């Protein structure tokens, strides 16, 4: 297959730049503790300096993989699939989610919301970033809002973002891993005073699993 053909298939969403896929325990947010199959799609231009998967940014370093092959592997594991990145909405997610739905799987997405929403999702975890704000249409669709807290200023950003989601959206504050010792007391105090928020931890890192 020629490079131009591969690029066309990726642009259509029939193939995707797959960084990795693995079966593990969801470590964050509302579904923490649940067995899930993760599909990590390469490509992201949001540019968070504290990102713990910077190797996902350049889509060209990850092989274009046919959606059919991705789904065949995913269907061997949990009934829940989490699509993450990178920023998965860089690409057309319709072919992937349609194929996963055909297998009867529950499909979650973790996204910054920086690009228009494509695909059919059972759960949308919106994690907005200051450098590239979400598109306005995703806010009312978010089931979960997860704000990464690097410093105290992020608490104000969290409230600005929470004002845009639906009343049913679950609200989470999660410490940026390298700053957890510093910001965790801030988060705990804030959640105690503002109980509409919950604390999210990267429990998979404490468990030493992917």
Predicted regions and their residues:
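A generic structural micro-feature
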Residues: 31-33, 139
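Compositionally biased amphipathic helical and low-complexity segments enriched in hydrophobic
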Residues: 10-13, 156
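Short amphipathic alpha-helical segments, especially helix-boundary/capping motifs
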Residues: 12-13, 44-48, 70-73, 132-135, ...
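Conserved AdoMet/S-adenosylmethionine-binding subsite of the radical SAM
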Residues: 89-210
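Polytopic alpha-helical membrane-helix bundles and their juxtamembrane interface segments
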Residues: 3-11
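Conserved Radical SAM active-site core
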Residues: 3, 16-23, 35-38, 42, ...
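A short beta-strand-turn-helix
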Residues: 26-29
């Amino acid at each position: 297959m020629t490079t131009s053909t591969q690029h066309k298939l990726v642009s259509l969403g029939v193939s995707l730049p797959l960084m990795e896929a693995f079966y593990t325990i969801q470590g964050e947010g509302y579904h923490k503790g649940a067995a899930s199959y993760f599909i990590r799609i390469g490509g992201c231009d949001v540019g968070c300096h504290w990102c713990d998967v910077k190797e996902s940014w350049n889509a060209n370093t990850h092989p274009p993989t046919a959606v059919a092959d991705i789904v065949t592997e995913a269907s061997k594991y949990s009934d829940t699939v989490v699509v993450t990145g990178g920023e998965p909405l860089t690409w057309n997610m319709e072919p992937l989610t349609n194929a996963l739905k055909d297998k009867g799987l529950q499909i979650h997405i973790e996204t910054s919301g920086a690009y228009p929403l494509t695909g059919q999702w059972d759960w949308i975890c919106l994690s907005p970033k200051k450098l590239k704000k979400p598109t306005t249409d995703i806010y009312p669709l978010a089931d979960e809002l997860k704000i990464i807290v690097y410093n105290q200023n992020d608490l104000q950003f969290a409230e600005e973002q929470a004002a845009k989601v639906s009343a049913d959206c679950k609200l989470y504050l999660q410490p940026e891993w390298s700053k957890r010792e510093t910001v965790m007391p801030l988060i705990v105090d804030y959640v105690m005073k503002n109980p509409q928020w919950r604390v999210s931890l990267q429990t998979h890192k404490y468990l030493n699993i992917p």
